[in-house]
Amino acid sequence: MDAHDLFRRLGVGAKFDLRRFSADAARFQIGKRKYDFDSSEVLQGLDFFGNKKPVPGDCGALRTHQELPDEEKTEESQIERKKQNRKKKKITSEITSEEEVSTIQWISSVEAKIEDKNVKRKNKLTSGKLEQLRKEKLNFFRNKHKIHVQGTDLPDPIATFQQLDQEYKINSRLLQNILDAGFQTPTPIQMQAIPVMLHGRELLASAPTGSGKTLAFSIPILMHLKQPTNKGFRALIISPTRELASQIHRELVKLSEGTGFRIHMIHKAAVAAKKFGPKSSKKFDILVTTPNRLIYLLKQDPPGIDLTSVEWLVVDESDKLFEDGKTGFRDQLASIFLACTSHKVKRAMFSATFAYDVEQWCRLNLDSVITVSVGARNSAVETVEQELLFVGSETGKLLAMRELVKKGFNPPVLVFVQSIERAKELFHELIYEGINVDVIHADRTQQQRDNTVHSFRAGKIWVLICTALLARGIDFKGVNLVINYDFPTSSVEYIHRIGRTGRAGHKGKAVTFFTEDDKPLLRSVANVIQQAGCPVPEYIKGFQKLLSKQKKKMIKKPLERESISTTPKYFLEKAKDKRKKVTGQNKKKVAPEDKS
């Protein structure tokens, strides 16, 4: 139907008002035509056989052979006119009604189409509003739990472990193990990290110490692997210390009980080479290890372990492993990453603190990485009461330590020192105070370290002296007090140290000794304490901040401190002189004999 037909149909029944628009009608010659000739003449010309005679004034009407009277003729003509008018009206009304019906139908169809479009628009708007409301709810949920996420196509967080069954079809035995272990609701890091890994996305995650990061990567790994196979290791977990690796291994074994997964840890490289070598049956699924032992196996010819089937590579305490120098494992990690050649491999980095180097590396090397952090970045746990204690000098530290012992404390207690030598010195000083104290450091054998950790967990040891490396990730349940005997070299190290207490929502306390020599490092640690809501002396806030170069220098080369000893200097110098005399006498030459 074109525009002309539409206009014609819409104009049905419209009449032109000749009286009102007479001038326009005359201009366009609209109206009745006035004839200036007699119609009888026309009729007479048409009578070829001369049968009829013209009647003047008949206006073209022909007379019949039998003429009717004027009255009857008038009545008959009126009746005929009425009939003709009725027929015309009927025909016109039928035509009009048909046209109106078709017009109405067409208009109704147009209206229906317009209504359909409006409904679709409403539906679109409704779906858009629903999506917007859903996003607002998710943002509210994340803000409530202090979850910060960066990335594209972010998976929705979970609020309960039952959602893993509803949305991801978790193994019923695995879910039961989670609930039996006492984990009723997921922690904030678990709420977001678990869905991210279940969607196969690469991850950089940071959360406070004791917030459940081990469970955050253990659950999705076990769900992803689904069931045991004989393809070799399909998941690899790297940690900086053997103690932390042992802890992760223990948690995974508990979590996977009854599922059949074979979870291994490298204790001795020689045994591992035979067990996991090329001639092995490959009846294993998950490996937990430290970098050095794994590198030793990879460098053998042929390699003592095959990582080509690894689908998930998790690096725990990633900021420590990415450090340069003797304490870091950056070179070893590069070799491990290259050994995992599967096209399915995904990587996840977990830590309590964000390191700039790790974040930049992840953004450059990981595919569509999602960054998840809980709380403020590089902040301490809010459940820990933090205190700075000025002790004046190195001698004052030991006096303050003994004062704490006299006042009484609630064990277990962790004491952090700067080096292995200082750990030994402090151990020899405290062992005579009548308290159960022990020390753990790298110079002790693995068996001694394991026994010490086991005794500390069992409550047989009240005070454990250790170096900073032990602060990484190890979960000592129920630690009530952390003492930073030597001031930490950075705010990151401080966060990891005090994170050994106040875990899983429990309250804890951290006391940090500082001397005049620690003044350059005070400002950064004081900021962390203040952010956690703990009081900081006003004069410390006025100290200058260290430049980044100075910070790195302090980390690589810590302050040289005096030896830990309460023996007065007079007796120390006297003993020193005595040793010199003894050594001097031993060096004296015997006089030659007189031969004459």
Curated annotation (Swiss-Prot):
Motif (DEAD box): 316-319
InterPro entries: DDX52/Rok1_DEADc, DEAD/DEAH_box_helicase_dom, DEAD_box_RNA_helicase, Helicase_ATP-bd, Helicase_C-like, P-loop_NTPase, RNA_helicase_DEAD_Q_motif
Reactions it catalyzes: ATP + H2O = ADP + phosphate + H(+)
Helicase C-terminal domain ranges (all copies): 383-544
N6-acetyllysine carried by residues: 15
SMART domains: DEXDc, HELICc
Motif Q motif: positions: 163-191
One Gene Ontology term of the molecular function aspect: ATP hydrolysis activity
Modified residues (Phosphoserine): 39
SUPFAM superfamilies named in the record: P-loop containing nucleoside triphosphate hydrolases (SSF52540)
Subcellular localization, as worded in the UniProt entry: Nucleus, Nucleolus
Residue ranges with Basic residues bias: 577-589
Alphabetized UniProt keyword annotations: Acetylation, ATP-binding, Helicase, Hydrolase, Nucleotide-binding, Nucleus, Phosphoprotein, RNA-binding
GO term, biological process aspect, one: maturation of SSU-rRNA
The keyword Nucleus is assigned to this record: yes
Region (Disordered): 68-94, 575-596
PROSITE patterns the record matches: HELICASE_ATP_BIND_1, HELICASE_CTER, Q_MOTIF
Transmembrane regions listed in the UniProt entry: none
EC code(s) of this entry: 3.6.4.13
Domain annotation Helicase ATP-binding: ranges: 194-372
Coarse class of the protein's main subcellular location: nucleus
Binding site for ATP: 207-214
PANTHER family noted in UniProt: ATP-DEPENDENT RNA HELICASE RHLE-RELATED (PTHR47959), RNA HELICASE (PTHR47959:SF15)
Entry's family note: Belongs to the DEAD box helicase family. DDX52/ROK1 subfamily.
Protein name: Probable ATP-dependent RNA helicase DDX52
Provenance organism: Bos taurus
